[in-house]
Amino acid sequence: VIKCHLSRLMGERKLKISDVARDTGLHRNTITLLYQETATRVDLDAIDQLCRYFQIPVGELLEFSDS
């Protein structure tokens, strides 16, 4: 299972989905799916944009878990 920590990252910075969408240029729906951890596919460009926006490595956004 791959976990996405977007909701935690946004919460720590008090950001709304609309803020991230506006600032990154990503579609609101893409961010919502990642935020709710319901995305089944994600474009690598979206991951790249989010990592650049939050200034974090991929491992802080996404985490692989055996459970």
Enumerate the predicted regions with their spans.
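Key DNA-contact positions within bacterial/archaeal DNA-binding proteins
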Residues: 18, 29, 59
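Residue-level detection of the helix-turn-helix DNA-binding "recognition helix"
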Residues: 11, 25, 36, 66
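DNA major-groove recognition helix of helix-turn-helix/homeodomain DNA-binding modules
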Residues: 45-60
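Short, charged recognition helix plus adjacent turn
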Residues: 8, 33, 52, 62-67
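A short, Lys/Arg-rich alpha-helix, primarily the initiator
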Residues: 1-18
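Recognition helix of helix-turn-helix/homeodomain-like DNA-binding domains
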Residues: 26-41
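The alpha-helix within a helix-turn-helix
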Residues: 10, 21, 51
